């Protein structure tokens, strides 16, 4: 919808542009053109003055030309017939003696989005590639990519590609970088520009003459080159050494990634590089740019996966500031958890304790969870702080503290006494589902150590009709069933009332079925109840699974200096694929073959110039596979791997299933504990879509565990990675001796 009065404005400007007195005065004429541009940017339709603006391009004033060319690029699609007149003017300016005019005209011509413009811009672009002025060559090189996009699904012009490859030897560094960008765009269907030995060495020698943007770009392209020998590799690393000290964060990160990729067979070199870039990473974490700060923090967490405690001496750099946004604070809290050691634990805990009373409830709860994470190592100090937080009687604080206590007593049974002493009275400040479930679980499992446990549960039973969360009711049923075994006199009556309500009045079928199950279980006998419900109250071995082992640098080196640490590898892979599909959805694959520049790229160097494939396995979380689909797929595949391991004792299904879930392996079906023979069927999927199906079989004598694995895609590296993960989990849970 046009603005009110826009027609009058257009008429006034059109009249002014045609006024010979204004045309004779350069400043007045330019001011009128500026008014046209200003109204155009404000949303007014200024296409009616197109002809007058084309006439205004016939001037020696470069500023005026630039304004007119901006206008032409905007309205050429709306006025294609009149735009042909503009093309004639632009073609004439492409031969102007002034290189600034030639470059400006060529850039504007390549920016015209109108049908049939390709035939007009091809020759000026080719001429521009051979222009004496570097500015014109810069524009012409980028114009090649624009021209290719205008051609759509046509074949790649081999002569043009050869011309661009030869321009990689240009004396102007910006021309070189623009050539790489254009070749990457033109050859994207063929895998992008090929970096062989001559090109790689040429780019390395020209690095010092590039600006910081160009250096970062070239470092990214050099990732595609694989040195042929160790001597060549270390020569390249020596050339890149100075860029680890660059003032530009982008250059430092690009150089670091190149070091990590090239030195994949030399872990000590990778470690040395990560030590040297500690300073730039810390500086980025303190940057005023919030986006840069957040990305740097994600990279710090990535480095800590391979070098725990790498930033421990600089832990204060990760203390939160009041003015920082929420997402940066959360990242810093996560980093602080990984930097705790004997020397700084007191200072870190005091800092986290201050965050627990922050006005932002989410941040306060994250700080409490962080203290709970540290409590696995420094139990006494953390339990004391958490107990003091209960005294604040704040609902959101109490809820998270109780959840932390629940996880803590499961992994650290030595703190059970202190937790049980702190619980009485906290039930008054818990209203949400997660907090209620945690409290009820603690009262049911450790109720014999909590004097008022039956009376707290009785309050929940009395108010069960008004309880809105089915999960709370189910937890309440289980807790009372457990507590009645240790304190029958106090719990028997309320258990009867709860079972009656769940069976006769409850509308949620899951709760009703749980009540019927427990009722029938009681009819069988108290011994059977003890056998089923008296499971272990803690399992410290699960802490080994939560504390992931150090990951080799090579497992994440390819993700460094990308958004993968920010989004997560699996999510970032999905985003990248969606972007590629959206970008190329209207394009057809190119089947063209073209000649390449003889002295820069040769056939024998193509194989060595390809980027090496990553052998890192990443399992996709939350895979949902039905039993029917599993069975159908299992029967259609052959066994890819089978191995037998020594085993001692029975399998604890709950512990094993939880451990497998931590590493993103789904349990399809599993035998109950003590079954003869014992079996389990598992599934997982990697980030490339490859499916892994596994069978665990424990022989009747409980002496051997057989693992059989099938995969949908025959990839040896992925299979070995999956088997390694599976064996690690089973070995941790069952203490396999292989």
From Swiss-Prot:
The keyword Magnesium does not apply. One of its GO terms (molecular function) is clathrin binding. Its main location: Golgi. Pfam families: Adaptin_N, B2-adapt-app_C. Keywords: Golgi apparatus, Membrane, Protein transport, Transport. Signal peptide: none annotated. Transmembrane segments: none annotated. It is a peripheral membrane protein. One of its GO terms (cellular component) is AP-4 adaptor complex. Residues 601-738 are annotated as: Ear. One of its GO terms (biological process) is intracellular protein transport. SUPFAM superfamilies: ARM repeat. Belongs to the adaptor complexes large subunit family. Adaptor protein complex 4 (AP-4) is a heterotetramer composed of two large adaptins (epsilon-type subunit AP4E1 and beta-type subunit AP4B1), a medium adaptin (mu-type subunit AP4M1) and a small adaptin (sigma-type AP4S1). Interacts with TEPSIN; this interaction requires the presence of a functional AP-4 complex. Interacts with GRIA2; probably indirect it mediates the somatodendritic localization of GRIA2 in neurons. This is AP-4 complex subunit beta-1. The gene is Ap4b1.
